[in-house]
Each structure stands twice: as C-alpha cells, then as structure tokens.
Amino acid sequence: MIDVRNLSIRFGSHLVIDNISFSLDRGSDMVILGHHGAGKTSILNWIFGQVKGSGEMIIDQVKMSNPTSKKLLKSGVCLVPEEGCVFPDLTVRENLLFSQTLINSNNPIPENEGFFKNLYHLLDTKAFSLSGGQTRMLSILMGMMRKPKYLFLDEPFAGLSQDAIDTFMQQLKILKSKN
C-alpha cells in the first residue's frame, strides 16, 4: 500500500496542493482528475522526489524520506511521465533493451502480443520516427516491462487512439492479475 499523508505543495506564494491524503492498495486503480494546472502532475513529481512539498509517504509500511527515482524503483514503484522516457536516437528495440538493462532483466522482449503488437513491426525504427501515439505506447511498455508493484501514468492516453487505449486497458488488467 502507498499512503500519502497531509501533502501540500507550494510554488513561491502559490499553494498548488493543500493538505491532501490518499491511500493506494496494490492492484487498485486511482485516477486524479482536475483541470489543466490543478496540480495532478505536481503530486506525481512530489512522489518521485522531483518537487518539494510537505507531507509524508509510506510504501508497503516503509516511510520514504527524500524519495529518489532509484529508491522508488527498488520499492517497485514506476512513473511513466507525460513527456515519456524514450531515447529518440535509439530504435524501438534498443529502447526496450535499455529499459531491461535498467531493471537487470533477462526476459525476452515481448513479441506480437497484446499492447506490444502495435509496435512489433517497428522494432528497428528509430524512436524519433514514431508518431506521438506510438512514442507514448513505447514509454508505457517500457514502464510495464518493469512489472512494477505500483505503476503511475501521467496523462496515459495522450496521443493514443481509442483502439490503443482499449488494448492498453486489457494489458493492464492482465498485468494486474499476474502481480
């Protein structure tokens, strides 16, 4: 379980997040809704130690003080940011292999199945040649390959077709059932 307690985030004199608390059980879904500029991304950035704020976070009964991406990855927490995490000069295959290296995984790249089927024919294509939706799918796949306990997605459907969204949701259900 992830517990966030009494989170407040301020940028200068502007209070963006005012004393919110929430809990997220492993395997559950949570959506943070709000208009542009409401602080949704700021919450994720605080969780991942990228912005300062007050409050506390407990992951699986361990208090996380000064969280870093490395600490969070070791705790099974993964963020796929809105802008993605793809290296444009690498091919799709190289991006996936690099992602595997980061997690010390020897698992083969998933072949023509599920969410990946939309990218499989592009394995040897440089990421800078992908459409916005394809780049987004690659970022999400790189995050899902880590098989995280907790997967945070910032604006997960930006640039995706309805077909890709439906396929992604099916794959997410499969991932949740396996973990």
Regions found by a protein language model. Give the residues of each.
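The feature captures the beta-strand-to-loop junction immediately N-terminal to the Walker
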Residues: 33-35
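A short, proline-enriched helix->beta-strand linker immediately N-terminal to the Walker B motif
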Residues: 144-149
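Conserved ABC ATPase signature
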Residues: 126-130
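ABC ATPase NBD coupling module
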Residues: 63-78, 83-84, 124
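Conserved ABC transporter NBD signature motif
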Residues: 55-64, 75, 107-114
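Helix-to-loop junction immediately C-terminal to a conserved catalytic motif
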Residues: 48
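Conserved structural motif at the start of ABC-family nucleotide-binding domains
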Residues: 2, 17-19
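Walker B catalytic motif
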Residues: 155-156
